[in-house]
Amino acid sequence: MRGIVCSLLAASLLMLSSCSSRVVLGDERFDVYLPLLEGKRVAIYSNPSGIVGDKVEGWCLKGGQEVTEASAGVPFGQPSAPGHPVVYGPHLLDVLLEKGVNVSAIFSPEHGFRGTADAGELVSSEVDPKTGVPILSLYSSHSMMPEASDMDKFDLLLVDIQDVGLRYYTYYVTMQHLMDACAAYGKQVVILDRPNPNGFYVDGPILDMQYKSGIGSLPVTMVHGMTLGELALMMNGEGWLQDSLRCDLTVVPCLHYTHRMHCTLILPPSPNLKDMRSIYLYSSTCFFEGTEVTAGRGTQWPFELYGHPDMEDRGFSFTPRSMPGAKQPRYRDQVCFGVDLREKPLKEIWSGQINLEYLADALAHMPSDSAFFMKNKHFEFQVGVPYVREMILARRPVEEIREKWKADADRFREQRRPYLLYRE
């Protein structure tokens, strides 16, 4: 049945235009960046998303297609027909080695170079068994910062990793640590840019730096709407690197991309973002990570539903199970009752706004206000300010909360403009 659905979907999508001409990723522009690597020891910062040109065969969809209602819920990696393997590649690492580039190290972020570790799970350094290149984890018990010995291994850092444009999505934090170190040690940084799937809007409060953490390290809005290349330019230009240093930075932009596009990715950027709909909902449903309500980790649809064992008045139910990417999900093997967002129209999700109605709705169906938010400050680390928790618990209208951060969003929208590489 899935094969039939995929075949029909693929046929219908052929009738739709892709994102402009075809978006050319930074990693495809060999003529621009290979000359920069000549005679250099090169370290790469990447993970499974570093597929050159987002090439994939055997999947229902193609990278770069305009996202539609029909395609938004198609799981990454679902084959176009039963028994047909989905093949990705080649990866940037393999291409560089094939072209004779001296790749001396790999830096890996949260979830690891292979992208299999759970959210927040520490990842050890190792040697890549395929290539023999050392993988230096920057999400380990040892350090979140590169060591001096790591910096001695390379002359130039090459970045190719898929981000989703949210302040609490940690890949940019690791990039910031690497840029800090490269600025201090005089190393070059080259970023091979990629589209931001949430790059079509800016929303949320600017981070109050008292809540600076591993899930929020820059004074930007929750949804910043920038690619990693643009964000790196802003870090450099605004003096946000450690000791206000600036690094020797080159960004290789995408071609034919604008911030108005909704382009399909080919791989989950992290284990629990399993389709495009989850990536769009994530800016609103990830807030449940700071509450006692689950956002669906341990199901096939994380961040596309939410619930709690005590919300028994809701008609929808699901049961989190242990699975890759969610080995110990909250409420494992317990029936949770809640809300299914999988049929929510994209037009509503693409409203250009963080949706706080989900939080307000969940609070209204919990047996006790005191049992809603976690006792720690995880929610504040996510949202970046103290007043959202207070106003949600006081049951203030969500538009009143949004109005409170409107000036932040407007100010950041203007502040970032000199660093944009693509049309808004």
Question: At which residue positions do the language-model features occur?
Answer:
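Conserved anion/nucleotide-ligand pocket segment
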Residues: 212-283
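Conserved functional hotspot residues or short segments at active or partner-binding sites
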Residues: 302, 306-406, 424
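Glycine-rich oxoanion-binding loops at beta->alpha junctions
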Residues: 120, 124-154, 166
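Glycine-rich, aromatic-lined ligand/substrate-binding cores of catalytic
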Residues: 255-332
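Short internal beta-strands
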Residues: 102-110, 192
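Glycine-rich, charge-decorated loop segments at or immediately adjacent to ligand/cofactor-binding or catalytic sites
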Residues: 115-119, 190-212
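Glycine/threonine-rich flexible loop motifs
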Residues: 163-175
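Bacterial Sec-dependent signal peptides at the C-terminal "C-region" and cleavage site
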Residues: 3-4, 8-24
